[in-house]
Structure formats: structure tokens, C-alpha cells
Amino acid sequence: MVKLLVIKQLYNLSDDQVEYQALDRMTFQRFLGLTSSSRIPDAKTFWAFQQTLMNAGAAPAIAQAVQQQLAVAGYIARNGQLIDATIIRAPVQHFTQAEKEVLDRGEIPADGSPAKRAQKDLDARWTKKHGKSYFGYKAHASADVRYKLVRKLAVTDAAVHDTNHFEDLLDETNTSREVSADKGYVDGEREQRLTAAGWRVKVQRKAQRGKTLSACQKGRNTRIAKVRARVEHVFAGLCQMGGQQVRTIGLARVFLQPLAEGEVSFYSLV
């Protein structure tokens, strides 16, 4: 069943399409270890399996198992790590003013039937990036420099600032203590704390209002950018897999959808 998840994420398929393609394609059947006479789970069974994984919070365990397989194959995290975040767009929700006020307080609207509430994404939030508004979630990822494989991930609503999960993403298994990030992660106090703990933090500097960066700071930013750009390759690969938008509802299900821990693991395997 986990291999069906791989197919779903790799080809960005719906549950019904997963069932059809598994029945129709011999290549998929060989990957699944099935024969033409084997029983293939239908779409409802596959949906129930995903629901079970979601309720059990099993996505991190699957991601950890993939990391162990990568390590056994020799893909050990090396040469430092790169931390960045990307937005996962979700279908825009339409709420009444009263519902918006309840959501702003961090509560869940009580009116309406359970079926109606199930069709409302109460976890996604609005954010702005480069002057443009986005609705959805945000994936915070840490990738190693050597292989550009995602090692740690956190998924939040889009309104959460990138820096909130910086320390949560630090990979202790990496052979290097160097960590690089863009200017959105500037935090002098945290950098001092991590440096004291043995980390070599390389965060690009941001010019203060009314001032410009010195030639030394610009040169430092350029050197960091050459290394940090490798993490953009990771997000570009996930984007090709349909990982920057979701068709599911709720943060819990996003963990089994594009750019969540399941797909990040599958990207690493690919």
C-alpha cells in the first residue's frame, strides 16, 4: 500500500486514477509486486489506508524509514545543510464574516453539519510573498548539500514565519555542522546560540532600512548563495511532481500530499 502512495505522489494522481493505473499498467504492477491475476486495492480501500496513516500520524515514521534506507545505500547527509521554505497553495475558502472572526481567534466554527465542515479547510491561512497573496500551507525543509536530499521537514499553515522552525530542522546526522539559509532567517541571538553549540551558521545578511550592504557583506552573500541555491533544485523537483498545490482539506492530510513528508521521502528516492 505504501508503494501506491509512491505512485500517487510521483505522478500526482487521484485515488481513482491510482486504482485505474495500477490495473492498466504492467510497469506499475511490477513495481507493486503484483501479477495480472492479483487483487488490487480499490480507490476506497486506498483512501481508508491514507486515512489510517493520517490518524496514526505515521507520515514521519515513513519518512524516517526512507532516511534509513538512504543511509544503508550510502546516501549519508554530508557537507552541511540548506534550510528554506516554500508555499503550498490550497483552494481558496469562502467564509462568512462571523466564521472569519472565529477562525482568527484560533477556534473552529460550530455551526453547520459535520459534512459541511468537512468541506471547509480550517487550517490553511493567507500570507504575502513579494507583494502577492497566497492561501494554503508552508513546507519548511532541510536538505543536505552533497546529495540535495530532504532530511527534515515541517509543514505549517502559510502564515507561519519561515524562521519559526529553523532549529527544528537542524539535522544532527549531517557530517558537517555548517548550515546555510537566505536573509529571511536573520536572527542574531539565535546565530550566537547555535554558534556556541558548535554550529557554523551562514545566513545571508539583509540591509537595514536606509542603508546598503558593505562590499564585504555583499561578497559574503554571494558565496552563501552559490551553496544555498542547491536547495532550490529540491523545490523545483517537487514542483514538477505537483508538490506546490494540494487538493485535500486540512493540515493533517497535507502531510500525505505534495511536499509533505511522504512526497519528500519519495522525491529523495527518485
Question: Residue ranges of each PLM-predicted region?
Answer:
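Alpha-helical support elements that line or immediately flank enzyme active sites
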Residues: 1-12
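Conserved, well-structured core segments
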Residues: 3, 236-237, 257-262
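Short, charged amphipathic recognition helices of the HTH superfamily
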Residues: 13-21
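Polybasic low-complexity intrinsically disordered regions
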Residues: 20-23, 33, 37, 41-196, ...
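Helix-centered, glycine/charged polyanion-binding patches within enzymatic domains
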Residues: 178, 183-256
